[in-house]
């Protein structure tokens, strides 16, 4: 049975996170963090099916290189409490064929984030098992031919969260219908749907 799960968080330096380390972990890559000098090697991490970088038309070509991208993000942030990236984690209906699941996630990302100027680093995990999901790391600064500019504060508007959550449900439900399934997922809580049910437990990140 398809379930709905979409969570959001900020990857911040004050919480001890590194954008480079986070991207390396999610993509199953080996990356050098030029700011700290640390090498993060997650090439033996299991479950990583694919990692894809999507960029807006304004982004220079080097932004499709994962190491260059996230090291540039680190260099653009000088404060100890800098917000480095936004992450969205979403569950993918396991009923969907892998190709359809992949394209559904990428279409959702293009429509909601890349079209607004964000760069998205999308990692697909456990696509052949019972917990297929995607991690989406998003940049927080405007990007142009010369690289990163100022922070785009509008992207932090809390009203976007509801829009993004509803959009994922719409994309997933269209894909389920195209695959011949009648069931749908709903981004609203059981309480908002008027249902007396106990929420399911998402298996969590991996």
Language-model features: locations:
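N-terminal nicking endonuclease/strand-transfer module with a His-rich metal-binding environment
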Residues: 1-206
């Amino acid at each position: 049975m398809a379930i709905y799960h979409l969570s959001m968080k900020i990857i911040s330096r004050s919480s001890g996170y590194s954008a480079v380390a986070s991207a390396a972990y999610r993509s199953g890559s080996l990356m050098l963090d030029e700011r700290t000098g640390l090498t993060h090697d997650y090439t033996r991490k299991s479950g990583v099916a694919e990692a894809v970088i999507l960029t807006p038309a304004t982004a220079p070509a080097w932004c499709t290189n994962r190491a260059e991208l996230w090291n540039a993000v680190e260099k653009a942030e000088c404060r100890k409490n800098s917000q480095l990236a936004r992450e969205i984690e979403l569950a993918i209906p396991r009923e969907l064929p892998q190709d359809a699941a992949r394209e559904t996630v990428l279409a959702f990302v293009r429509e909601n984030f890349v079209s607004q100027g964000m760069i998205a680093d999308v990692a697909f995990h456990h696509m052949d098992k019972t917990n297929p999901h995607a991690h989406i790391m998003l940049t927080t600064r405007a990007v142009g031919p010369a690289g990163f500019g100022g922070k785009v504060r509008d992207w932090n508007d809390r009203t976007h969260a509801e829009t993004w959550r509803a959009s994922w449900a719409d994309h997933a439900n269209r894909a389920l219908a195209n695959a011949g399934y009648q069931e749908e997922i709903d981004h609203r809580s059981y309480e908002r749907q008027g249902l007396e049910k106990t929420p399911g437990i998402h298996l969590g990140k991996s």
